[in-house]
Amino acid sequence: MSKQNLEEIIQTGIADTELSTEISTAIKRPRKYKVLLLNDDYTPMDFVVEVLKHFFHLNEEVAIQVMLQVHFQGKGVCGVFTRDIAETKVALVNEYARMNQHPLLSSMEPE
């Protein structure tokens, strides 16, 4: 291999590298999480409706539908939020239930 061919290969390699280098500017949306209420045998239905209205701003009709889903299916989706908001809502609901001496539990899972 001649010195000239080696220089051409080096230059071509460098040129190809420079052309193929691109900066990715794609921005991903944050992952969403479902906030769930879990059924238990002791929390009154009206308390569950109160929680749904207060913490998730659901109207009476939708709150009752979600409460019935929790009651009959074991869990119900209260809303879908970014991670920080979902974590905050779960903590607030669980604390509120404890303060009112109810075993109601809230949790979250990725959408």
Curated annotation (Swiss-Prot):
One of its GO terms (biological process) is protein catabolic process. Gene3D superfamilies: 3.30.1390.10. It holds the Pfam family ClpS. InterPro entries: ClpS, ClpS_core, Ribosomal_bL12_C/ClpS-like. Involved in the modulation of the specificity of the ClpAP-mediated ATP-dependent protein degradation. Binds to the N-terminal domain of the chaperone ClpA. Belongs to the ClpS family. This is ATP-dependent Clp protease adapter protein ClpS. It comes from Legionella pneumophila subsp. pneumophila (strain Philadelphia 1 / ATCC 33152 / DSM 7513).
